[in-house]
């Protein structure tokens, strides 16, 4: 098996377990079992669990941002439609069968107080999302302050959807976003 295939298999297993069960409840032996790799190989690739957590958050961040941007691009050139498409995408994401909330909020809640690495990744992800929204708001010719309001709507929807396993918070946030844009 190629090095890339081993890495993919390992990160797939780690992501499924970390996101599904929480980081602290998953041991390296759980990841070994799920990935089918030896514990020796696992520790060769990631000598510490925190490094595997970091790789998981980095990979998930890239995929999350790509999926959001791809969906927003399907809204076409209209700046307001693109901005509102963020909330449409949140509803799609919240409706995924394995949705368990925001991986960065969950990770920060578990480890943000004891892991500077996890705290940094959570902040970087949230800052990137805020900046993405700010860009969409500017493209729509609206004031930067609106981006902060929309950001808080989206973040609140993420937390609520994760807790209640519902897509309704995305629709409610979309309604509030429309009111702010009116």
Language-model features: locations:
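Helix-turn-helix
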Residues: 9, 13, 17-51, 55
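Hydrophobic/aromatic-rich alpha-helical bundle segments in the mid-to-C-terminal region
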Residues: 117-127, 138-181
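Alpha-helical DNA-contacting segments of helix-turn-helix folds
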Residues: 53-60, 67
